[in-house]
């Protein structure tokens, strides 16, 4: 079969300014997958930065062996779909990523997939309807409430109505604005003010009083619709749901144990500053309850593929913060739970053989990967483990067997030599560095995230963290190191 994996980008992107480097590279990972499924043709069709699919150096795409690489150039979904159709695909898999300021690439990829399906191509992609619900945070809030999922109480503020008198001179009294402030006064403070269409926590503000909310809504910061939510205190987490659509039209979701996220000084998880630890399958967090609820969520929204969920454990109950039907910054860590690489999981989705609970086929594939690549990164990312141990991990929902722990921590910019030196450590699984030459603020310049672990106790994970600090004292950032130590200590 001819398999096409695609993603798009609606933003201007200059590869001479923004540099992304991963170890192992996507070129290596996709070459390995294509080699192990050599009876199929692989096409990677993307727009830069082509996250999860392609590597690039300045403007040149680094092509993978045994893989056809195509740079998409269309603007509309119709144009992009035509480019993909020209590749004559049997299957097309969306590998959507995220951008700022609008988290709508999943929606664009869904429209492309819808056109492909209409033209007879089998796709693995979330529907346009699902993406539309999750793109707009107010629509998400309504969906969660209507379907009895726990989430924060919230008030939606329509920008045009809030300032209705500016465009309608006959308006003497803005009734809508009075209504909005009355509704906000009923919320428990503090509250979070967020854009209804922004990505993750970008632009969010924690506000502690009603006068402060008034000041915000009367400021230039308020320039589009906002969602004002109660701030739910508690530990923040994230996880992924991998969902297969069956031949009978039913859906089989697999919810992975959650990763714990650190928060910034405002109590918000920041993508550029967070430390992630997990997966955590602990009784005290009622992960069985979480799994059941998220399986229900996946079936109602009819997920197909990978979706990421942000959560908070508030007053001994799970609450949903955000739903992202796309790949995420946690996708590499989640793949490791399956002892796979992300490209391998996407390939199995394309071939219709992906089963998050399977053991026999997965073990066979993993062993082939490691046997044929014993001197490269596969030794780390696809560790060969006994069938009994693998089965115990996959069936942990019943046996409560502990999953191997991983930590995702961020470093300042590293040289390529430093990145490769870190990767020589046997427990370091993955590095990804983003560097923006045009940025002026420190946090905007980018960072290098390191994923390490694969051990079954927090003590062992802490020892790995200490080894990194000892061997690379010049690059580790103390604030992230201390946060990671505290998070690991919370499990001891």
What are these regions (language model features)?
Residues 229-301, 324-350:
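ATP-dependent carboxylate/phosphate-activation module, predominantly the ATP-grasp catalytic core
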Residues 151, 173-175, 186, 190-193, ...:
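Conserved ATP-binding module of the ATP-grasp superfamily
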Residues 153-165, 190-216, 236-238, 263-282, ...:
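Glycine-rich phosphate-binding loop of ATP-grasp-fold ATP-dependent ligases
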Residues 67-76, 155-156, 172-175, 205-208:
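Short acidic-hydrophobic, aromatic-tinged amphipathic segments that line or gate anion-handling sites
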Residues 1-123, 163-166, 368, 372, ...:
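ATP-binding N-terminal substructure of ATP-dependent carboxylate-amine bond-forming enzymes
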Residues 347-371, 378-379, 383-492:
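Peripheral (often C-terminal) accessory segments that flank ATP-dependent C-N-forming ligase machineries
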Residues 113, 117-203:
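A conserved helix-loop-beta module that forms one wall/lid of the active-site cleft
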Residues 298-332, 387, 392-400, 410-412:
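Conserved metal-phosphate-binding beta-hairpin within the catalytic cores
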């Amino acid at each position: 079969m001819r398999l096409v994996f695609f993603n798009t980008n609606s933003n201007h992107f200059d590869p001479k300014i923004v540099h992304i480097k991963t170890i192992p590279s996507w070129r290596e990972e996709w070459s390995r997958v294509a080699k192990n499924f050599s009876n199929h043709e692989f096409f990677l069709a993307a727009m830069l930065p082509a996250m999860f699919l392609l590597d690039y150096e300045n403007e040149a795409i680094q092509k993978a062996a045994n893989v056809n690489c195509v740079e998409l150039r269309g603007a509309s979904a119709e144009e992009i779909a035509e480019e993909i159709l020209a590749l004559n695909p049997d299957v097309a898999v969306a590998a959507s990523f995220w951008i700022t300021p609008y988290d709508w690439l999943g929606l664009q990829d869904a429209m492309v997939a819808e056109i492909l399906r209409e033209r007879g191509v089998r796709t693995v992609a979330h529907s346009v309807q699902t993406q539309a619900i999750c793109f707009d945070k107010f629509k998400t809030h309504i969906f969660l409430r209507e379907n009895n999922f726990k989430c924060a109480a919230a008030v939606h503020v329509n920008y045009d109505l809030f300032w209705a008198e500016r465009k309608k001179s006959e308006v003497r009294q803005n009734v809508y604005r009075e209504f909005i402030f009355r509704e906000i006064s009923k919320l428990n403070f503090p509250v979070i003010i967020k854009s209804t269409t922004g990505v993750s926590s970008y632009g969010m503000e924690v506000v502690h009083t009603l006068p402060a909310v008034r000041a915000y809504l009367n400021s230039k910061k308020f320039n589009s619709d906002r969602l004002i939510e109660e701030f739910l205190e508690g530990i923040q987490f994230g996880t992924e749901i991998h969902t297969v659509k069956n031949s009978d039209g039913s859906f089989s979701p697999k919810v992975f144990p959650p990763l714990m996220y650190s928060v910034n000084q405002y109590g918000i998880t920041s993508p550029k500053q967070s430390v992630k630890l997990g997966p955590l399958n602990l009784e005290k967090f009622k992960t069985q309850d979480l799994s059941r609820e998220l399986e229900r969520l996946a079936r109602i929204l009819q997920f197909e593929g990978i979706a990421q969920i942000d959560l908070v454990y508030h007053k001994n109950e799970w609450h949903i913060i955000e739903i992202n039907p796309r790949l995420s910054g946690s996708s590499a860590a989640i793949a490791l739970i399956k002892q796979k690489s992300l490209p391998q999981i996407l390939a199995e989705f394309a071939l219709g053989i992906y089963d998050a609970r399977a053991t026999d086929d997965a073990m066979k594939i993993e062993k082939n990967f490691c046997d044929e690549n014993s001197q490269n990164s596969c030794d780390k990312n696809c560790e060969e483990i006994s069938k009994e141990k693998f089965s115990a991990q996959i069936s942990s929902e019943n046996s409560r067997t502990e999953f191997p722990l991983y930590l995702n921590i961020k470093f300042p910019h590293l040289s390529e030599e430093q990145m490769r030196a870190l990767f020589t450590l046997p427990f370091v699984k993955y590095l990804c560095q983003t560097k923006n030459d045009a940025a002026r603020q420190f946090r905007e310049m980018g960072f290098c995230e390191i994923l390490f672990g694969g051990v079954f106790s927090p003590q062992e994970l802490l020892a790995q963290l200490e080894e990194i600090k000892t061997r690379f004292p010049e690059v580790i950032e103390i604030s992230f190191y201390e946060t990671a130590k505290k998070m690991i200590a919370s499990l001891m």
